[in-house]
Amino acid sequence: MLGMFLPSLAIAQEIKVPTGFQVSEIAKELGATRHLTVSKQGHVYAKLSKLKDGNGIVQLKDANQDGVFEGQKWFGNYPGTGIMIDQNFFYAASNKGVFRYALDANGEIADINKPETIVDGLPDHGRDNAKPFVFDRDKKHIYVTIGSWNDPCRVPGTGQGMNPCVILDSAGGVWQFDANKLNQRFQDGLRYATGLKNAVGITWNQQTNSLFAMAHGRGQFHDFYPQYYTPQQSQELPAEAMYEFKKAGDDAGWPYIYYDHKQNKKIVAPEFGGDGKKTGGEKALDPVVAFPAHMGPNDILFYSGNQFPAKYKHGAFIAFHGQSAELKKGYLVAFVPFKNGKPSGKWEIFADNFAGTDLAKPTGPIQHRPCGLAEGPDGSLYVSDDLGGSIYRIQYKK
């Protein structure tokens, strides 16, 4: 389906960014736009988690490269989150699989009605069922998140955890598949990374040649274990954490442990004998970076462009889809500087006020929730919003 609208270069002054940066709203009211990708021609593609007029993918085209995206093209009759484009194919995910579309000589999708299946039949239990994906550096493998539908891997109706947590056999991690083989099924994959309740934000760091993932933390400590956790602790724990997976089998520890960013320790989950103080997970990974609880990291991008100032080169941008009771902040894009593949400074807020209201003293409903990130060929940063359906372009104006 083709669509046209009457756009203009709308400067989004309500979005707060560092001095020298400018934010423009290149589209709005698109629907539940999740992850993004940008072609080398500068066309922006977004995946929708809910169909809009029967379509789950939208292409935004700036035909004359003037910064105004005057054309829309809708296709793909399946909802989902993951999306990516390279020189040969356009890729998109449903909640059960990943598909690819061949590109023509102009970098356009040759036939929007003829996707090929890379993998299908992945577990989908209706909750935390997004299938974000990423390729490794040499494009030999594709890595797909399969989130857990059970927040703490607790036996229903009890306060006890499943021990062992059988969910980890088919969820709670990232699975590796052959990137160049068609019609694969779940059983063809390798569980590459485990111990991740739900990693909506995953990426391949080209500098370290390794997989990075942003883990959504569990919740409801006080609801089920008031003897160990106060309501405030329940609001402020556990950390939302960034992990680096260097090899198959690396384990972030869920559901047996969680990371407490206040104690700077891996703590045994109460379902498995913990009391909020007992440490564990000696064999589990330590986080690369720990963020406040319940911020909902939904995408991560390592910046490779040259448009932004030097401090941003190879650093990590993270789109946060929720808010922190601890900070009274949320719905923002954060930045972590990196040097030689390691964080070189504290995380900071890069783009803020997507919410459109002061979260410490809200006066109205939330307006926008950052969800996806993408880098354009000119080094611009794109941010999707799956609440208001806007897409933003952040540029550095020298």
Language-model-detected regions and their locations in the chain:
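A short helix->beta-strand "capping" segment at the edge of beta-propeller domains
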Residues: 13-31, 345-349
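Beta-propeller domain segments
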Residues: 16-17, 130, 148-187, 196-198, ...
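Beta-rich catalytic cores
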Residues: 29-32, 53, 71, 78-79, ...
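Blade-level signature of beta-propeller repeat domains, shared across WD40, Kelch, NHL, RCC1
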Residues: 374-398
